[in-house]
Amino acid sequence: MNIDNIIVPLDVPNEAAAIALIEELPEIIWWKVGLELFVSCGPQIFSILKQRQKRIFLDLKFHDIPNTVAGVCRSAASYGVDLLTIHATAGRVALSRAQQAVLEGAKIIGQKPPRLIAITILTSLTSRDLAFDLKIPLELPEYVLQMALLAQESGLSGAVCSPQEVEQLRRVCGDDFLLVCPGVRPSWAEVGDQKRSLTPAQAIKAGANYLVIGRPITATADPREALRRICQEISGDQKEGS
């Protein structure tokens, strides 16, 4: 595990703020573009990142009928992004169509297709939310597993899950299935609205490929120092466990 496995969200309101954050953390390779920034400045953000040789995690969490998600995934892939998300609850047909569309979109520009990964369930939700609000009669870990298996069976590259589900998904889905984990909080940071969090070191030990770490880095007075502390915490834990 190294800094290339950390994804920092560009959870900022506009292009100027995005550029400022990117330049403040030059060592970060992976940046996540979510709904707020994409709605604010559109595909221009992709050019900004590519000019700086960054990799792009486009996290718009597509969720619609099969024809619509296929169209939007084809368009997204044609921009040359590296990772792309779709909700597993869009269903098997939509997932399969989206995966095929990603290949088609990448072919248009002659580039390697992005890896399409499924949102299993939002990391802000709890077992109680699943049972009482969403009326889903499964324990949360089982539900996440079923969504991940649906994604894998539909040809997707991986899934987004909380760190607490990583160990089970890695065991069942295998080493080639990409696991991306938001809801990661270092030992010294507040959990906030993430209900199923672990520390970066714990998530890595469980089998995560990429860690999405936002506010513990970006909401601090010194983001570079926060990033250094996170890397130090991970490195120290790995040395202790070796």
UniProtKB/Swiss-Prot annotation:
Gene3D superfamilies: Aldolase class I (3.20.20.70)
One cellular component term from this protein's GO annotations in UniProt: cytosol
SUPFAM superfamilies, A to Z: Ribulose-phoshate binding barrel (SSF51366)
Reactions the enzyme catalyzes: orotidine 5'-phosphate + H(+) = UMP + CO2
EC code(s) of this entry: 4.1.1.23
Pathway linked to the protein: Pyrimidine metabolism; UMP biosynthesis via de novo pathway; UMP from orotate: step 2/2
Binding-site list for substrate: 11, 32, 59-68, 123, 185, 194, 214-215
Annotated function: Catalyzes the decarboxylation of orotidine 5'-monophosphate (OMP) to uridine 5'-monophosphate (UMP).
Family classification: Belongs to the OMP decarboxylase family. Type 1 subfamily.
Protein's recorded name: Orotidine 5'-phosphate decarboxylase
Species assigned in the record: Trichodesmium erythraeum (strain IMS101)
